[in-house]
Amino acid sequence: MARSTARRRALNTLYEADEKGQDFLSLLDERIAQPGAQTPLPEYAIEIVRGVDEHRRDIDSQLNTHSTGWKVKRMHAIDRNILRIATWEILYNDDVPDKVAIDEALNLSKTLSDDAAPSFIHGVLSAIVAAKDKQSPQSTPLDDSDKDESDQTN
């Protein structure tokens, strides 16, 4: 099953739990045990929900830091959970390129949210990626001035 479908199924689970005030993992366990009319949850959807739950405090902190004028609790539930999924993918899932995480979040927001959501989501996620890139130093080769003098021969 495509990862896009898995993201959407994870979003459905996170959104439903959020709206009900239910714990993410307890609803996930219900969905795994009794998928109802839908096909069983894809493994990647389960991984997303568990990952978002495990890192929720840090994810929400990142969202609060990088969203101007909007705290997580004030965001629309659908936008909040789209952002949580993409932030988890950006910060905790090295298998997904940052650009893909952002593009997938934008696709979900264009279909499921209001007209202002895609630009808001893009801005927040771009800021998170920029902060992540700033924190992870790029390795650069040493030039001659960085070498220890004992390594140089006369």
Swiss-Prot record:
Keyword Transcription, does the record have it?
yes
Q: Which GO terms describe its molecular function?
A: RNA binding
Q: Where is this region: Disordered?
A: 132-154
Keyword RNA-binding present in the record's keywords: the answer is: yes
Q: Which UniProt keywords apply?
A: RNA-binding, Transcription, Transcription antitermination, Transcription regulation
- What's one Pfam family here? NusB
Highest taxon of the lineage: Bacteria
| Any single GO CC term annotated in Swiss-Prot or TrEMBL for this entry | cytosol
**Where is composition skewed (Acidic residues) in this entry?**
143-154
Write out the GO biological process terms: DNA-templated transcription termination; transcription antitermination
- Tell me the function of this protein: Involved in transcription antitermination. Required for transcription of ribosomal RNA (rRNA) genes. Binds specifically to the boxA antiterminator sequence of the ribosomal RNA (rrn) operons.
**What is stated as this protein's family in its record?**
Belongs to the NusB family.
Query: What is the protein name for this chain?
Result: Transcription antitermination protein NusB
- The record's gene field reads nusB
